[in-house]
Amino acid sequence: MGDLSANSEPVLTREQARAWALEAGFQEAGLVALPYAAETRDAERFREWVAAGRAGTMGYLKRKSEDGQLLRERAEIPFPWARSALVCFASYTFPSEPLSTKTAERGSAWIARYAWTSRVLPSRVLVGRGDPKGERRPSDYHKVLLKRIRAVEARLHEQLGEFESRAYVDTGPIVERALATAAGLGWTGKNTCLIHQRLGSFGFLAVLLTSLDVSEGAREQATPASNDRSPGAPAGSVAAGQWPGLQVADRCGSCTRCIEACPTDALDVPYQMDASRCISYLTIEHKGPIAEEFAANMGRQVFGCDICQDVCPWNRKSQEKALHSGPMAVDAELVPRPELVNPALEWLASLDEQSFERQFNGSPVRRAGFLGLKRNVAIAMGNSELARFAPRLEAWTAAADEGLRIAARWALTRLRRD
């Protein structure tokens, strides 16, 4: 996989790293040498974003090193030995999925599709336009993808010997999207999501940091061109998936659908998100009461939000390609759980703490917490205009939890007003 000749240090080559990542079950992978060309710019933008208070109460994004640098400014701050990053993409889109932006049965909720994941038995299926067949069991994408990226890590160690390495799936002090962009997996859209030209933005990222150098040829290919956010392609850029590791052109062009669709104006500036206003942040990370100005615009979202991605033309294109390409290989460990697609608010409200733990064991939904989900359900009930939810909300107005109690009172007032 690299140069193992006498008196030479082992190095990574893009072709072999990508091949092994795809063999491990990822749909795409890219390799970038550290530091990468745009790292200083990206670090400055991250510092400015945090300083502006756009991280909300997410303290983990504000953690600093002993010398006062934000850990997530660049990977080399927490990991000074890091010389390269292998970034892998696993798609969780599915061609027959409904959209959060489409009309649904009244009284239904929306759980972000990344939290729908389950695995199908047997382990691999081929489907056309229908759903995969077989028994489904909940799956935790963190565990699924960490197992895959560690398999790649182990294979690298087998071939190249001892070196420093660290694998992460959503849990490390790194900005995965910046590394993915530098590795050529896509561009950062106006909704701040990584967009892969063929696969869209509905994907998980797994990162393997290593102390290995990237081969000189790969380093030359991986040097990003400057990205001025213009609709045109920067010099040296290519289409996503053609040569992972090259800078991918920003293909958002003049489109502003994501900005216009955001109900809480979290995307107030293109390519920037005010996380403190984002429905995903409010329903998952934010603890306690949710301000009325946000609650009234949260609609039926009870865990996360897909609106800015559901309106993105690149996601529609990726699903259309899947629909019309005949039988396609589906990631059997990341298929939707039917009961989490447009679930009934009554069902979510009826869960006690024990059934919540059982239903969402290993699921991202657990991050919101039992009471956090109830708070979100109360708000969705208030936005539903359905009087039948009033008795449940009445009971919650006496809840010990402040967030749930205030949400229930607000929801009741809203229902009675409507």
Language model features by range: what are they?
Residues 197-220, 224-228, 246, 274-294, ...:
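Short, charged low-complexity linear segments at domain edges
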Residues 36, 257-280, 287, 300-330, ...:
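Iron-sulfur cluster-binding cysteine motifs and their immediate structural context
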Residues 336-371, 378:
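Alpha-helical adaptor scaffolds
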Residues 366-368, 397-404:
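Short coil turns that connect the paired helices of HEAT/ARM alpha-solenoid repeats
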Residues 374-386, 406-417:
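Structural detector for internal amphipathic alpha-helices that build alpha-solenoid repeat scaffolds
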Residues 355-359, 386-397, 417-418:
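Amphipathic alpha-helical scaffolding segments comprising HEAT/armadillo-like alpha-solenoid repeats
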Residues 2-224, 243-249:
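Auxiliary alpha/beta "docking" domains used to position bulky ligands
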